[in-house]
Each structure stands twice: as C-alpha cells, then as structure tokens.
Amino acid sequence: MRSFASDNNSGVHPLVMEALNRANIDHSLGYGDDKWTEEAVAKIKETFTPNCVPLFVFNGTGSNVVALQLMTRPYHSIFCAETAHIYVDECGSPVKMTGCQIRPIATPDGKLTPELMQSYLHGFGDQHHSQPRALYISQ
C-alpha cells in the first residue's frame, strides 16, 4: 500500500540508499563533524546562498518545529486551517517546543483566505493576547 501521509511511510530513492551504503563503509565523527555533512552544507550554500545556515533534522515534525521556533517567540500565535498537519498530526510538538498558541481556523476546504482570518487578527500590542506572528499553509 502506498501512502503519502508522512515521509516516514516509504523507503528511500535508490540513489539515496546507494549514498547511505557508501557512507556506511568507514567510521566518521558524528554531530556534523564529518565529510558527508560538510559536503551537504557546501551544496546547500551553493544552491541557496553562502550565508545560509543549514539545520539538519530527521523528520518533518522536526523541520516544522525548527522553522516555527526561528519565526516565533512564546508570546506569539500561529494560524492554520483546522485541518493543518501541525494542528492535527504532530501531537502537540509545535506547541510544546515553541510555547506558541496554535489558532486553528475553520475552513470549508482547508484553504485560508483573508476573509476567514480577519476575525482572528486582533490584540496587536495587547499584553493579554498572544501576538499573531505566523501563518502555516499546507497542501
């Protein structure tokens, strides 16, 4: 059975497995002090910008949490459709790790519009309200 619900549900592309097998032949220092990480960082900087700082994580939840942590502080709120992956499928990890409030918005089709969000955009500068900061969009 094929499932696209998570990146954890399938095997890797044969080229990825081939690269893993090549890397598995010898010993390497861990925690980013190895030639494989150095090569990956160089390729990422070449592709995007020399100033970027790649942060490697092992799954989608980790990448979502890191991205949200970089954009928010604990007094912020994150808006998303009520069907959004970060609200439905990540077991509270984004809330726990960011300290932010996730504000799910009811939608007829999982798509947010300015009109649907309008009633949530209040409390700016009010210390008694979490401050709107991020909008999570998923397919």
Model feature map: region roles:
Residues 53-72, 105-107:
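Conserved core of the PLP fold type I
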Residues 2-3, 52-56, 76-78, 101-103, ...:
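Structural motif
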Residues 70-88:
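Conserved PLP-anchoring active-site segment centered on the Schiff-base-forming lysine
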Residues 1-19:
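N-terminal amphipathic/basic leader segments beginning at the initiator methionine
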Residues 6, 50, 54, 109-110, ...:
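Structured catalytic cores of enzymes that bind and process phosphorylated ligands/cofactors
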Residues 13-60, 82-83, 87-88, 93:
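Conserved N-terminal alpha-helix of the aminotransferase class I/II PLP-enzyme fold
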Residues 97-139:
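PLP-dependent aminotransferase-class I/II
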